[in-house]
Amino acid sequence: MGVFNFEDETTSIVAPARLYKALVTDSDNLIPKVIDAIQSIEIVEGNGGAGTIKKLTFVEGGETKYDLHKVDLVDDVNFAYNYSIVGGGGLPDTVEKISFESKLSAGPDGGSIAKLTVKYFTKGDAAPSEEEIKGGKARGDGLFKALEGYVLANPDY
């Protein structure tokens, strides 16, 4: 099995606590309201903490598909959240799982710095394609910006 790491960092004008609430605490309810392609997020097993399995149902290319996410870490104090895609339609054939390690910290002017490490655990030594990496980054950036936009549009949130 090969492991391929990718790191990304972005900033937001939203404070870490408010952004974490949207990205993690309320995400199961908020994401399907904000992202049209995502129909639902439901807990299949667990209580929301580490070890929980979530099913994310989405529409892609006119087809309804799903991903299974395993929660690896929830740290509400340090605004950290880690999870892995462990099954479903979002995994390329050459990938066993994709892990995401995210952390929000204080940024300039009361905003946030979001750091993300993505690890592709591949079958054999196959590296993820450039297309897979770019597509995943685009989806992640879109999700982040949509939730950030929701928080900015709802000051009482």
UniProtKB/Swiss-Prot annotation:
Record InterPro entries: Bet_v_I/MLP, Bet_v_I_allergen, Plant_def-hormone_signal, START-like_dom_sf
GO terms of molecular function: abscisic acid binding; protein phosphatase inhibitor activity; signaling receptor activity
GO cellular component: cytoplasm; nucleus
Pfam families linked to this entry: Bet_v_1
Tissue: Expressed in roots. Detected in nodules and leaves, but not in stems and flowers.
GO biological process, one term: abscisic acid-activated signaling pathway
UniProt induction comment: Not induced during nodulation. Up-regulated upon pathogen infection.
Family: Belongs to the BetVI family.
Designated name of the protein: Class-10 pathogenesis-related protein 1
